Amino acid sequence: MQHTNILLAGATGYLGRHLLKVLIEKQNQVVAIVRKPNQIDNPNENYLEIKQAEVTKPETLRDICKGIDTVISTVGITRQKDGLTYMDVDYQANMNLLAEAKKSGVSHFVYVSAINGDKHRHLKIFEAKEKFVDALKTSGLNYTIVRPNGFFSDMKDFLQMAKSGRVYLFGSGNQKFNPIHGEDLANAIVENLSDYNKTITIGGPDVLSLNDISKLALSSLNKPIKITHLPDCLRRFTIWTLRTFTSVKTYGPIEFFLTLMAEDNIAPTYGKHHLKDYFREEANTLKR
């Protein structure tokens, strides 16, 4: 189904760029929000309008949803920067968008959160996301909550470790999940734009353990398989130490990563891109 007027917030991020490409390929009329005009090339002015605004500054968003049918927001941060907190971005910036959407009579708001965010509200990064999810569900607008597994781009950390010739894991490394490529996730979101008031939990086509991912990373760099398993108590101690002695800016992303890596996070499978191929492509870049 073609959606004629879509506002895309977060268009310059990993997922946002894939979404922009898919939306235009499907001949949607897209308004992309950017902080700087040169952040996105506009190869097709027939389908894309670029508007400069900052989602954390509501005065720059005034009437930005006028004439829009659907808002898609991928707005969120993993690491706090520029003096902005998770609450400033993941919650309040999306609330700013939601307020404009309601004012302009937008019919559908799509928000990209993360897998098991509702289960891990105690984590600072999820606290902000889930607070917005709650607000969106009670806003009166039709909504879609997308809960993807980890992105392929997040798996680069395994490649960085593999460059040294060894990957370090906490615990057994048998925890499983199915990361997803940005293009696959973008396609899934666009395919489901006609479905309202639902939550979509989604992952890539391959369910892999942390050991599997470590082996793929090492193999892609032609390294021997060397994986060191650290006691899980060290993971828990690391989280406690960081929460006790550092700011949320420091411990937030590490707490998020170490918590989710300690359990299975398996979502319904989708897509055609495989992590093995992605690692090979990225490894070729690292070798140059």
Can you say where each PLM-predicted feature lies in the sequence?
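NAD(P)H-binding glycine-rich loop region in Rossmannoid oxidoreductase-like domains
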Residues: 7, 38-96, 100-103, 116-118
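N-terminal Rossmann NAD(P)H-binding glycine-rich loop of SDR-like oxidoreductase domains
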Residues: 3-26
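Substrate-positioning beta->alpha
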Residues: 171-192, 198
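Glycine/proline-rich active-site loop of Rossmann-fold NAD(P)-dependent oxidoreductases
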Residues: 153-160, 191-200, 223-225
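A hydrophobic C-terminal alpha-helical subdomain
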Residues: 232-288
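Substrate-binding strand-loop-helix patch
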Residues: 176-183, 202-220, 233-237, 273
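Non-catalytic, hydrophobic alpha-helical segments
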Residues: 15, 71, 185, 189, ...
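Glycine-/Pro-rich loop/turn segments that contact NAD(P) or position catalytic residues
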Residues: 77-163
